[in-house]
């Protein structure tokens, strides 16, 4: 795992139990899954807009915001990026069409 992602996950875990009045991350955890998911959706939308209408610097910034908020959502569910990477590895060599069809079961 990239050490920058490991540091991000460690900071998010550490702030999970912090005072919501003094930590943005703690305040999101305190508001629950729906609020965290809403923030991920907002950041995803901003990332899409940046990709379509802005330059690479703005896209990079918005993608970082998206990754940050996705990290919070994953931590809230007890998941890490290692879990996501394992799922991607599981899908390697499988047609996207076949993989999607296998989830309909």
Describe the residue ranges of each PLM region.
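Flexible "arm" and connector segments at domain edges
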Residues: 1-63, 67-105
């Amino acid at each position: 795992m990239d050490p920058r992602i490991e540091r991000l996950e460690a900071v998010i875990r550490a702030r999970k139990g912090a005072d919501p009045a003094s930590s943005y991350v703690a305040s999101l955890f305190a508001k629950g899954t729906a609020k965290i998911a809403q923030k991920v959706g907002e950041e995803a939308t901003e990332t899409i807009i940046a990709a379509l209408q802005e330059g690479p610097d703005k896209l990079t910034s918005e993608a970082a915001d998206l990754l940050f908020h996705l990290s919070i959502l994953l931590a809230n569910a007890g998941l890490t990026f290692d879990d996501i990477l394992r799922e991607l590895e599981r899908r390697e060599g499988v047609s996207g069409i076949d993989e999607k069809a296998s989830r309909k079961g």
